[in-house]
């Protein structure tokens, strides 16, 4: 049993050596014969290989290598077992050859790795060569423990699980050969099964290298360093292509998808049934993401990734900025370089799947060639498929992006055609009902019978092209009367709200990210978009502004900020006033709807309302009176009926019809100029636009006059409001003054009343006090006490009593009141003596005078005692 284990292990070593030689040969051949830019030719077979078939050719090369390895195992099994010494010598020689081949391959990779696509593949080849070197060195350093093993563990040894990775020990080959000769029994069937389990895919070499490199320390001098988990390079391989199972080694890869796996990943099913030993290496593996590439330019290196149409981080920095500023709300137009890159890819993509599968089906039917040429061809195909995957993935992004753009364009054109056809049908019915009694209508300038072609061409034209495409020659009116009805039914009628060629909103499948920027797209006769115009929708003023109204999006942002600052009440008042003013009639008799001037030049319907009886102004000559009278009901027409002078007497005046909302043909009477005008108008779309703009400018004077009248009315309204406010303020002022005066009078009246009341109270109080004092004087003071006769006789008793009561003196009593009432006037009255005299000491009177308090001498002036002092 141990001998069988040893033979199986030696067989694994030989298989690894053969696989390493094959890989090195493939690397050298691919570096010499493979063009990394085109990835389409093979120098050996000279056959064109599409990038789509490269992923499907890869498993065939792997299975052929495995079949060759099986044949080598069957033929060399006995030699490996019986000759260990020769085998070790062969291994040393193979190591030297492999090292030389690896050096040559590295040089070839460095010389040929000039393209961006081949950089990742060169790194992968270097990692493969390093792993192959590690494999050869690790095989010699794996010690095997030949200790006796129980019989119960034979089932475990069949799965190659009991590897004992210990320190390196010398192997005794003599004892080993003796054990082998005694116990060896060959079982070819079991060896074949084990070989099928081992050699299913060339990636098993990397798996064994990972297991051995994580458990053994290698000498730095003899081997190259093993790449750490941080230096693992990611290669994009299909995620839906599972590793081949042990029972079916010739499995084929299925539909490729773009996900990533590392070059050093392990497959548990192909190495051993125990997942424990292999899962240890998964701890050191980092999850690698797919190499990111720009959707527009295909570059994989940029300082920052930006959000694109397909999601987060799908554009590089430059393309993201460009798409944000120019093409976010429109449709991206790839550059000329990208279109040139897509041409060979589109040609390869158009090939049917049956042709792509032909080379894959023909390979098993071919007879087996010698091993070396067949292996080289298959390995070259495998290398081409690996290198073409990054380029194919980048090109698929561009193809998908262009396909989505084309789908959106087709959907928009279909919707536009449906809207145009519906509006055309409605207008034709209206026109047929109104003009059923008329016999003559305006016709086309070209007298052709191809009416269906004209209808299909004019159905998708913008309203501007209808002016110059419809012309009438008055000289040929009589010959075209029979075909007027058919021709008129096929003339597109533009101008109504339903038949605007520019949609106000884009379809639901391609709505822009911002609501204020709807798209406007014109289409030519073939249905392809000729112009991508964007409109700006302001949510504050609730209007869609054309792109020509603003220089850039920043100016529109300033407009939105200004609208947001206005109060809502003021905006609503202005809108209501303008709506009221828009209903009034203008001077010319036309009704115009309120607008602020920033109207898209293709939309003439905003000016066309409520006009029922406006006839065209005709400058008729004598030759065309009958025809022009029949055309008097054709409103809104431009009639230039002059056969003599086309420059002097031409008069153009636009009259807008609001019931039919159409612009009929322009009547040019000069037959020589009609053909020239048609040819120049068809070949010059800018001239058509210019003519249309000039025609719109003719409406501006009427519009300006209406705006001026609106401003005057608003001014008068403001003046009236101001007068009303001033009158209200005056009334309030007068009322306030009256209130103040009334309040002041009330205050003064109250203060006077209070002062009078206080005065009357004081007088009453004084009188009462005087009365009481008089009562007390009669009680305590006798009437004749300190009374002296008065020198005069002018005071009466009553007056003395009143004066005494007011001056708080004692009452004056007349002693003769009771006795002599009749002689009061003749007698002297008595007067109370002053208290000073009462209490002062008696003094002798000075003869002839008296002295005052100051000691001054005074002479008495009494006539009775007149005496002069002696002169001394």
UniProtKB/Swiss-Prot annotation:
Domain of life: Eukaryota
Low complexity bias: start-end ranges: 188-240, 254-277, 349-393, 410-458, 465-489, 608-656, 806-826
Transcription regulation as UniProt keyword: yes
Entries under SMART domains matching the protein: ZnF_GATA
Disordered: region residues: 15-75, 89-137, 188-279, 333-393, 410-526, 602-656, 663-682, 806-829
Organism field: Dictyostelium discoideum
UniProt name for this protein: Transcription factor stalky
Zinc finger annotations (GATA-type) as residue ranges: 294-319
Summary of the knockout phenotype: Cells destined to become spores end up as stalk cells.
Main localization category: nucleus
Composition bias, Polar residues: 490-508
Listed Gene3D superfamilies: Erythroid Transcription Factor GATA-1, subunit A (3.30.50.10)
